[in-house]
A protein has these predicted regions:
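Short linker/helix segments within small regulatory modules
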Residues: 81-92
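Short cysteine-rich clusters marking metal-coordination/redox-active sites
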Residues: 70-73, 95-98
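Short basic helix-loop element that most often maps to the first helix and adjoining turn
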Residues: 5-24
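Recognition helix of helix-turn-helix/homeodomain-like DNA-binding domains
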Residues: 25-41
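Short metal-binding segments enriched for Cys and/or His
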Residues: 97-116
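DNA major-groove recognition helix of helix-turn-helix/homeodomain DNA-binding modules
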Residues: 45-60
Length: 146
C-alpha cells in the first residue's frame, strides 16, 4: 500500500475528518487532502506527528517498505509490539519487551539474552540447540550488540 492509502484508511478507522486531522497536526485541510490524493507526502517531522496521532509506525504509514526486527532480541516487529519512547513516539528499533521510556528493560549480556529468548521461540521445544545457534549468530548483527 502507498502512504495515501494507509493514511486515508487510518484516518477513517479513527473516525476523524480531514479537518480534524489538519487541526491536530497544525496543517491545512488542503494539505491533508493532497496527501490522500497522493499529490504529496508529508515531511519527516509531520510523519512523526501522524505516527503518534494514529498510533502506528512511520514504516507502516509508508506502506511497510522494510521488515523491522528488534535490535536487541531479534523479534519481528509490528506496530502492536514496538516500543515507545518517553515522548510517546513509536520506536521502530526495539520491541516493547526490550525498551521502554528511553532505556533497555533488561541489563544483560548477549548470552543471557540468547537464553532469555529461546523459550519464546516457536521451535524451542523441538530444537533448543538449533534455536540457540540461530540466536548466537543473529544477536551480534543487531545494533544493541555491535
Amino acid at each position: 500500500m502507498e502512504f495515501k492509502d494507509v493514511f486515508t484508511e487510518k484516518r477513517r478507522s479513527l473516525g476523524l475528518s480531514q479537518n480534524d486531522v489538519a487541526e491536530k497536526l497544525f496543517v491545512t485541510r488542503q494539505a491533508v487532502s493532497r496527501w490522500e490524493r497522493g499529490e504529496t507526502v508529508p515531511e519527516v517531522e509531520t510523519l512523526k506527528s501522524i505516527s503518534r496521532l494514529f498510533g502506528v509506525s512511520i514504516n507502516t504509514l509508508l506502506g511497510s517498505p522494510r521488515t523491522l526486527i528488534c535490535q536487541s532480541c531479534g523479534m519481528p516487529l509490528s506496530d502492536d509490539f514496538m516500543a515507545r519512547d518517553t515522548d510517546g513516539a513509536i520506536n521502530e528499533s526495539y520491541c516493547m519487551w526490550c525498551w521502554k521510556d528511553g532505556q533497555f528493560l533488561q541489563q544483560c549480556t548477549m548470552e543471557e539474552m540468547v537464553e532469555h529468548c529461546i523459550p519464546h521461540m516457536p521451535l524451542a521445544a523441538q530444537d533448543p540447540e538449533g534455536c540457540r545457534a540461530y540466536m548466537r549468530a543473529l544477536l551480534p548483527t543487531l545494533e544493541r550488540w555491535k
